[in-house]
Design a protein with these regions (language model features):
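Intracellular juxtamembrane helix-capping segments at the cytosolic ends
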Residues: 33-47, 331-345
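Helix-to-loop junctions at the C-terminal end of transmembrane segments
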Residues: 78, 250-270, 285, 290, ...
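Loop-to-transmembrane helix entry/capping segments in MFS-fold secondary transporters
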Residues: 49-58, 233-235, 346-356
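Intracellular loop-helix junctions on the cytosolic face of multi-pass helical membrane proteins
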Residues: 10-20, 49-209, 398-411
Length: 411
């Protein structure tokens, strides 16, 4: 499906056929998201417990490598060929090759029979009604706040945060009620399966809290480096694209290999502590500023993911902090995905992994408004100290749930 849509969009002009082009772009987003869910479900089903860590690390490393392909190589091809149509056609052929390779080499997996779900038509109707209900709930929450004289476009970030939290508070229970009311069995039974387990709410809290400190720090890292410390865009881009991306891939692979030896609980604990410590690097940058450790020069280069047509000076402190932070993030993400894999029941692996990973992204998505308010209010050094403190609740909960995590790993 992705190959076909990519091929079709290559034949269109966004200027002459904007509506059809936009529709195909939406289709690409829908199909790619569906592909992610199916792949995660397949990986969850086929990997035995002792291979979840390494499998998750390989997935993280491959995902980052694919980002290089789509975000770096594609632009190089576009410049060389002077044609985005050829780039999309090439991507279509690559997707077709991946589909053929999947058919040829992917392990067949026969899922154990489970409970019969509702008819697909009824499920689709329930899903559509749930989306409509969520949209209506968001509109209603905004309307109520507007009636009280608040403006959703107000420059005050506290007011923007109030709108966001109000919309979530009304939309989430509305979605769950509609799913129950209209028989969205895939979602309902997935939730029932999860919440009948021992300590389900504690596990959900751990999922939200584990990456929270990392999410707080990452949400404002780039504005901090560019606006506060006055690093150049080229310097930050070079460090992030080369050292940061390389460190995250390396960290994911190292984390996977370590999980084979130390197990899931200790991996989550050790990598979580490393993520906490890495936030102090930005605290030191905020205290001492640029130039503390000196700098080094990069000669001109042209590689797959980046190019530089002149010599550039790179700050050693910046490079070191970003390398350590991305290394820790890669290791922590690999362990975190291994936990989500272990938590997903084989009968509902697609739905449960998608829901759990979405829950794990709550911090990353919704802390940005809070961070945007907090950093100017308390200052950058205090903000990064706060991000480190926000990593502690997840680690403390992880320690308290040690026996439960070990039990989950062995399932």
């Amino acid at each position: 499906g992705l190959a076909v849509v990519l091929w079709q969009i290559a034949q269109l002009s966004p200027v002459q056929q904007p509506l059809l082009f936009a529709a195909l772009a939406v289709a690409i987003s829908f199909l790619s998201a569906s592909q992610d869910i199916v792949f995660d479900a397949w990986r969850t089903d086929v990997l035995p417990s002792d291979e979840r860590g390494l499998g998750s690390s390989l997935m993280v490393a491959s995902y980052r490598a694919a980002m290089v392909m789509s975000g770096g190589v594609a632009f190089i091809w576009a410049e060389q060929w002077q044609s985005w149509a050829k780039v999309y056609q090439t991507m279509a052929w690559l997707m077709l090759a991946a589909a053929v390779l999947t058919v040829l080499v992917a392990e067949r997996y026969e899922r154990a029979p489970g409970q019969k779900l509702a008819a697909p038509g009824r499920e689709l109707l329930a899903f559509v009604l749930m989306l409509v209900g969520v949209a209506a709930a968001v509109w209603l929450a905004r309307a109520v706040l507007i009636l009280f004289g608040l403006d959703p476009n107000d420059a005050n970030k506290w007011i923007q945060l109030l709108f966001l939290l109000s919309e979530i508070a009304l939309a989430l229970p509305t979605a769950l009620w509609l799913a129950r009311r209209f028989g969205f069995d895939t979602l309902n039974r997935s939730l029932d399966s999860f919440f009948t387990r021992e300590g389900a709410w504690s596990v959900l809290a751990l999922i939200v809290l584990y990456k929270l400190g990392d999410a707080f720090a990452g949400s404002l890292t780039t504005p901090f480096l560019l606006r506060e410390l006055q690093f150049t865009s080229a310097e930050v881009g070079i460090v992030n694209k080369i050292m940061g991306l390389g460190a995250s891939i390396f960290g994911a692979l190292v984390g996977g290999l370590m999980m084979v030896r130390i197990g899931l609980y200790r991996a989550l604990l050790w990598f979580g502590v490393l993520q906490l410590v890495s936030n102090f690097g930005f605290l030191l940058l905020a205290w001492y500023g640029r130039g503390t450790l000196g700098s080094f020069e990069l000669p001109p280069f042209d590689i797959v993911i980046a190019s530089l047509d002149h010599r550039a000076t790179v700050d050693w402190a910046l490079a070191s902090v970003v390398f350590v932070e991305q290394l820790a993030a890669g290791m922590g993400t690999a362990a975190f995905l291994a936990l989500l894999t272990a938590l997903s029941h084989s009968q509902f692996s697609a739905t449960q992994f998608a829901l759990l990973s979405a829950l794990g992204s709550v911090g990353r998505v919704y802390v940005s408004p809070v961070s945007g308010v907090l950093a100017p209010a308390i200052g950058w050094p205090a903000f990064f100290a706060f991000t480190a403190l926000m990593a502690l609740p997840g680690l403390l909960m992880l320690h308290a749930m040690r026996a439960r995590i070990v039990q989950i790993e062995r399932q």
